[in-house]
Design a protein with these regions (language model features):
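Bacterial N-terminal signal peptides
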Residues: 7-19
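Surface-exposed extracellular loop regions of Gram-negative outer-membrane beta-barrel proteins
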Residues: 236-277, 386, 416-474, 535-538, ...
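Exposed, low-structure sequence patches enriched in small/polar residues
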Residues: 370, 465-803
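Alpha-helix capping and helix-loop boundary segments enriched in small/acidic/polar residues
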Residues: 253-254, 265, 297, 365, ...
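Outer-membrane beta-barrel proteins
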Residues: 181-191, 224-234, 251, 270-274, ...
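N-terminal secretory signal peptides that target proteins for export/translocation
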Residues: 1-7
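Structural preference for beta-rich elements and adjacent junctions enriched in aromatics
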Residues: 24-422, 787
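Outer-envelope beta-barrel architecture signal
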Residues: 88-90, 132, 174, 192-196, ...
């Protein structure tokens, strides 16, 4: 017996002696278990190599399952996660096993989620109660991504934090280190034990699989309320203060002027639950150009915010999921509805009333308005979250030409304000909240005020979700308007979701001074049904999306309605196939006459098929073919091609070409006259991105959209809503025309430190419309390119100082 005890002791000693640095004890996590994270003041060199002794001392977790496709099986490779913290922040170390020949490392600009490459992601619910959170990711190659999260899974990339992440290849795959400072995140004020929700994610590019811990695929309703709870002790971040002085030099090659600008941004977090941000004399000339879009309709195109100051802390002003309709689903979610669209601030200027018959230079009509400054306060006090925003525009200048010559005229900038309060329920059970939002725009042409109330409900099991918002607008010279909507979403089972929405906007409601809705005078009912499956033999996954809506205006006229079918299949060879079919009913168009009456359009159909190769390969390509019916019965076709070449992790070349051939395209001509056109639209694009290293980027983007339209038939809008009346005698008034928009931007960016950059940006943009005069596409392009409305070189240095 003594011999057996001795042998047992020797076996135990040998067992633990054989545990190497990469084989620390693996901890199995029980359902609902709160993980106590290890505190340590160990020094870490953030290089992704996990070679500090602390990483060998910590237990590790490997609880990952496959969530995309949502098979929930154990992955084919191991992923070991280790965590520790101190009063500065949370440290995360990850070992990702896989064959080294399968690694996919591609550098890109920050927050580019479209590229398929190996990465490690992390979500933290710092509220500890499923109210709000932050997500972080480091890609193999050290490109970072981050953003914010609202219930239940409203992910946004519109936030950049001062955190660090790095990666490194190993003999068994790759590894990553992340350091998340407590001070960059909002957290409730509390002492003692602090609960935080944790979610880890890994994307394996060569398999096109996403793995996560805990198991939360997109096909289940819950996310932020179902994260893995972890506990840390006595985390009370110190007061955080950051000052970002900046200097910018802008050479305007059109006016031949050079502008020198000094400015500063301030980020101050006096406690864990309050943040103050301010900017003085900012320069946004280095912001990335918007996509080139030609829109000749009466509805506005929405462009997302790209300026860092307005992205920081913006989530508290999100009063509804409708505020951000960007998503990964195959269905078209439409334009957003939001009362706070910060792109209005510093956007196109309000044009002044001219004293006589003059004309304002096109450049001055579309140039962004300079800002004098802005301030924003966001925070939390118990169950209440709040936010306040104020911004002040400078007075814009306009070059006016009339019969007497050319002179300069000074307009007036606007002042913007927004206030937000959100009361959330206590943790446990269903999530309930109610919010108030008020906005104000002051301008000499008239002030605009908007007030709203919103409510949100999420069942305890995450299946039923309700979001509602009601608002009223008070605009000088217009009677008070009212509007609102309510959305219901129910998860029938895993992978099957049904949504129903009802909205009403009266004829007077107008939130466009600060917010964004595409139209008022509208009563609409809409629905969507989405099914996602991964238990298929012929494909990795398949998503079917069926949507439909009907709407009418205050006169009771049916203004639009249709059924929309979309299906996206990810095939077993990782190629993608997308089918779309839209069936639009005959309806009355009360917008595109631009206030000259209402007319009836025919029912029509649209269909397309698209294919794309495996985007994880060095060369990927695809295209689309489609058919589109016109409003008076014409037949149009669309074709697009695209390709991406990534010969290595530093270089990326993109090329695309869209071509649209329209027959009987119906457009407003003048007054009560509509015209049809035979039109061609050509839209080539080219992008080149080269990374000297992960911190230095060269980027060139060239986009052009050109339209050549030849006149067809003239129609008269009836006095009362009805069919358009053919008017051969007015054919001569319908003229051939062309439109050309060109955007060229070359950027050099050097990230000197987190959120500290040197930019050199050259931007040239053209926007020209006029008579076609039998010109070719090449001539249309050349004429507009030689007459730019923006031609500027900007050099900007911004550096972060502070704690």
């Amino acid at each position: 017996m003594a011999v057996l005890r001795l042998m047992l002791r020797v076996w135990i000693v040998l067992l633990f002696a054989g545990v190497g640095s990469v084989n620390a004890i693996q901890v199995e996590v029980a359902p609902g278990q709160v993980l106590q994270i290890h505190p340590s003041d160990a020094a870490i060199a953030l290089d992704g190599q996990l070679n500090e002794s602390i990483w060998t001392e910590l237990d590790h977790y490997d609880e990952f399952v496959v969530i995309e496709p949502d098979t929930l099986i154990k992955p084919s490779h191991r992923t070991r996660v280790r965590l520790f913290y101190n009063d500065r922040g949370l440290f995360v170390g990850v070992e990702a096993e896989q064959p080294t020949t399968t690694l996919v490392a591609r550098l890109s600009s920050r927050d580019n989620r479209q590229i398929k490459r190996d990465n490690i992601g992390l979500v933290l619910d710092t509220s500890g109660e499923g109210r709000y959170g932050y997500w972080f990711a480091v890609n193999l190659g050290d490109t970072l991504m981050d953003g914010t999260l609202l219930p239940e899974k409203q992910f946004s990339s519109d936030w950049d934090g001062a955190w660090e992440g790095a990666s490194s290849t190993t003999s068994s795959g790759w590894s990553a280190e992340l350091f998340i400072p407590w001070g960059i995140m909002s957290m409730p004020k509390q002492s003692g034990e602090r609960r935080i929700g944790l979610y880890m994610e890994r994307f394996v590019a060569y398999l096109d699989e996403r793995w996560s811990w805990p198991a939360l695929p997109d096909t289940v309703p819950r996310f932020i309320s179902a994260l893995q709870p972890i506990a840390v002790q006595d985390v009370t971040p110190k007061q955080q203060f950051s000052l970002f002085p900046s200097t910018a030099i802008t050479r305007d090659r059109i006016d031949g002027e050079t502008e020198y600008r000094l400015g500063a941004d301030l980020f101050w977090r006096p406690s864990t639950n309050v943040q103050v941000t301010a900017t003085v004399n900012p320069d946004f000339g280095i912001a990335e150009s918007d996509d080139v879009i030609i829109n000749l309709s009466a509805t506005e195109t929405f462009f997302p915010e790209k300026r860092l100051f307005f992205l920081e802390g913006q989530e508290v002003f999100t009063a509804s999921p409708r505020a951000d309709t960007r998503g990964g689903g195959v269905g078209n979610r439409g334009a957003p509805y939001t009362l706070v669209n910060t792109r209005r601030i510093g956007g196109k200027p309000r044009l002044p009333v001219l004293p006589g018959e003059g004309e304002i230079r096109v450049k001055d009509q579309i140039q962004p308005t300079d800002l004098l400054g802005a301030v924003k306060v966001t925070g939390q006090n118990g169950q209440i979250r709040y936010g306040f925003l104020a911004a002040f525009e400078d007075d814009p200048e306009f070059l006016v030409t009339d019969d007497a010559g050319t002179y300069r005229m000074v307009g007036e900038g606007s002042q913007y304000g927004a206030a937000r309060l959100l009361l959330e329920d206590k943790p446990g059970g269903a999530y309930k909240s109610v919010g108030l939002l008020s906005t104000m725009v002051l301008h000499e042409a008239g002030d605009a005020l908007v007030q709203s109330i919103d409510g949100h409900f999420l069942g305890a099991n995450g299946k039923l979700k309700i979001d509602a918002q009601a608002f009223t607008s008070d605009k000088e010279g217009i009677e008070r308007g009212y509007g609102g909507f309510i959305d219901f979403e129910y998860a029938l089972k895993q992978g099957v979701t049904q949504r129903v929405g009802i909205e009403y906007f009266d004829e007077a409601v107008d939130v466009s001074d600060f917010g964004f809705i595409q139209r008022n005078d509208n009563f609409r009912i809409r629905q969507s049904h989405i099914r996602t499956r991964s238990d298929l033999d012929w494909a990795r996954s398949n998503q079917f999306d069926f949507r439909g809506f009907v709407q009418k205006n205050a006169e009771g006229l049916f203004t639009q309605g249709g059924l929309f079918f979309s299906n996206r299949s990810l095939l077993n060879n990782l190629h993608e196939l997308v089918f779309r079919l839209d069936l639009l009913a005959g309806a009355y168009d009360d917008l595109n006459s631009f206030g000259n009456g209402t007319y009836r359009v025919d029912p029509r159909a649209m269909a397309s098929v698209g294919w794309a190769s495996n985007r994880a390969k060095p060369l990927s390509f695809g295209g689309k073919l489609g058919y589109m019916g016109e409003e008076l019965g014409g037949d149009s076709s669309v074709m697009s091609l695209f390709a991406t070449w990534r010969p290595n992790d530093r270089l990326s070349v993109d090329a695309m070409l869209n071509y649209l051939n329209r027959k009987d395209w119906l457009l407003h001509s003048q007054g009560s006259t509509m015209g049809t056109y035979a039109a061609e639209q050509l839209a080539p694009g080219f992008g080149l991105e080269y990374f000297i290293n992960a911190k230095q980027q060269l980027k060139l983007v060239v986009q052009w959209v050109g339209v050549k339209a030849r006149s067809g038939s003239a129609y008269e809008i009836p006095d009362q809503p009805g069919d358009l009346m053919r008017r051969p005698d007015l054919d001569v008034s319908v003229r051939d025309f062309s439109v050309s928009q060109v955007s060229v931007q070359a950027r050099y960016r050097w990230e000197l430190a987190p959120l500290s950059d040197l930019f050199v940006v050259y931007t040239r943009q053209s926007n020209q419309a006029g008579l076609l005069l039998d010109r070719s596409f090449n001539e249309v392009f050349q004429d507009s390119y030689q007459a730019p409305v923006t031609d500027a070189l900007v050099v900007k240095l911004r550096y972060r100082f502070g704690s």
